[in-house]
Amino acid sequence: MFQMSYYYSGLGWDFIQHVDQTNGVLNVVSPDFFYIRKDGSLLLRSANPDVIKALHRRKLKVVPFLSNHWDQDLGRFALMNRVLLAKQISHAIEELDLDGVNIDIENLTEKDRNLFTDFIRLVRKSIPRHKEVSVAVAANPFGWTKGWHGSYDYEYLAKYADYLMVMAYDESRLAGPTASVGWVEKSIQYVLTQKISPQKLVLGLPFYGRCWMEGQSASQAIPLYLVVSKKA
C-alpha cells in the first residue's frame, strides 16, 4: 500500500518527530527541497543527510517533490531545459541517497502536453529503475482536454511513472466543497478510462478545508489539525 505525505518545511530534525506521530501510517515522505530556477535548472535546498538516514532507519522512502508552485513561466522553463534538469535530479538522488522524485508541475496547458510527457520520460530514463517516479496530475471529472487539465497525458505519463497522484481537491471556485464524494469518484473513474492500471493510481486527499466569503472567490484555507482541535 502506498501512503505518502508532502512536507513543506524543509527536512530538519523536527520532521522526525512529526513522522513518529503518524504511528507508522506512512511509507513515503516527500519534502520540498527540489526547486526550479528561473533558467529551468534545479535548485537544491539544504537537506540533512543524517535526517534522511534516520527516515530510512524507520523504513520510510524519501521522495522529494519538484514543483513550479503554479508559476506557468517557471514550468515552461523547466520543460525547455528538461534534458539538463532530468540529469540534475538524477545526480541529486544519487548524491543524497534519495528514493526517487515526485513531479508536481501545474498550470501548464494542452500546448505543453508533449514536452511534459517527454520530461517524465527523461526523468525515468535518468534514474535507476528501482528509484520511484511519481507524477501529480489534475483531478479531471469531466475529461477536459484544454487548459491545465489538458497538460496531462494520463495514459502516456503512466508508461513512465510508477504512480499518478490525482490531486482530488480544490473542487470549488466559489463557496462549496473542497472534495465532494461524487466529484472525487468521477475523477478516479476518468483516470481509469485512460488505460491506466489501478495499481498506479494514488488518490491525493486534502488536509484542509476552506472558509468562504459568500459570493466571492476568495477563501482562507484551514488546516485539518485546526478543525480537529477546534481552534479554527
Swiss-Prot record:
Instruction: Note the SMART domains from the entry.
Output: Glyco_18
Which keywords does UniProt give here? Carbohydrate metabolism, Glycosidase, Hydrolase, Polysaccharide degradation
Active site per the UniProt annotation: 106 (proton donor)
Q: Does the keyword NAD apply?
A: no
Outline the extent of the GH18 domain.
2-232
- Report which superkingdom the organism of origin falls in: Bacteria
Q: Name one GO molecular function term.
A: hydrolase activity, acting on glycosyl bonds
Coiled-coil regions listed in the entry: none
The protein's matches in Pfam families, at most eight in alphabetical order, are given as: Glyco_hydro_18
Q: What is its EC number?
A: 3.2.-.-
Q: Which InterPro entries match?
A: Chitinase_II/V-like_cat, Glyco_hydro18_cat, Glycoside_hydrolase_SF
Which GO terms are recorded in the biological process aspect for this UniProt protein?
polysaccharide catabolic process
Question: Gene3D superfamilies per the record?
Answer: Glycosidases
Q: Which family does it belong to?
A: Belongs to the glycosyl hydrolase 18 family.
User: Can you name this protein?
Assistant: Putative glycosylase YkvQ
Q: Which gene encodes it?
A: ykvQ
